[in-house]
């Protein structure tokens, strides 16, 4: 899921 990858980048 590409969208999830973007979300985790912000959470990290």
Curated annotation (Swiss-Prot):
GO molecular function: beta-galactosidase activity
Primary localization: secreted
Record's keyword terms, sorted: Allergen, Apoplast, Glycosidase, Hydrolase, Secreted
GO CC terms of this entry: apoplast
Subcellular location: Secreted, Extracellular space, Apoplast
Catalytic activity: Hydrolysis of terminal non-reducing beta-D-galactose residues in beta-D-galactosides
EC number: 3.2.1.23
Top-level class of the enzyme under EC nomenclature: hydrolase
Miscellaneous comment as given in the Swiss-Prot or TrEMBL entry: On the 2D-gel the determined pI of this protein is: 6.23, its MW is: 90 kDa.
Family: Belongs to the glycosyl hydrolase 35 family.
Record protein name field: Beta-galactosidase
Organism: Phoenix dactylifera (Date palm)
């Amino acid at each position: 899921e590409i969208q999830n990858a973007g979300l985790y980048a912000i959470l990290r």
